[in-house]
Amino acid sequence: MHRIAVLTEQETRGAQMEEQIARFCKERGRFPRIEPYRNQESFFCAVLTASFSHAVIALPGVAGLNAVEHLRALCPACRIIWCSDLDFSLHAFRLRVDYFLLEPVTEEVFRRGLLVWLEGRTSIAPCSFDSNNH
């Protein structure tokens, strides 16, 4: 059984991501254990006791980068979707992240990431950029 961690500081956003993951998996006859975390300390304590098969890291700025780097060091085989407000796509490539999403993340783009992640499909686009052309 898949063990999926969702690390985000925002409770509402975390709940939305957890719901999307559960719905996506249910449509495919999969029923993973989804575990929400609102801070890095509790997340990494959990990683040390039992590794995750998959993780969504949705933290702002350098906090997200640090979390992904630390997770990769502790759990090299973990499949990762990383959502960030800063363009860390080159770091995501270096850290072997399955799917990198640049904020704002739409439900459609997140589902695309889940396809790559849970069904082993290859990524069409390594990152998603918003339409504001920053």
Model features per residue range: what roles?
Residues 36-53:
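Acidic, metal-coordinating helix/loop segments flanking the phosphotransfer/catalytic sites
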Residues 107, 111-134:
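CheY-like receiver
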Residues 11-35:
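Two-component/phosphorelay signaling modules centered on CheY-like receiver
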Residues 63-77:
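Short amphipathic alpha-helix used as the core "switch/output" element in two-component signaling
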Residues 103:
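A Lys-centered signature of the CheY-like receiver
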Residues 8:
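Conserved acidic carboxylate
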Residues 56-57, 77-87:
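A short, hydrophobic beta-strand element within the central beta-sheet of small alpha/beta folds
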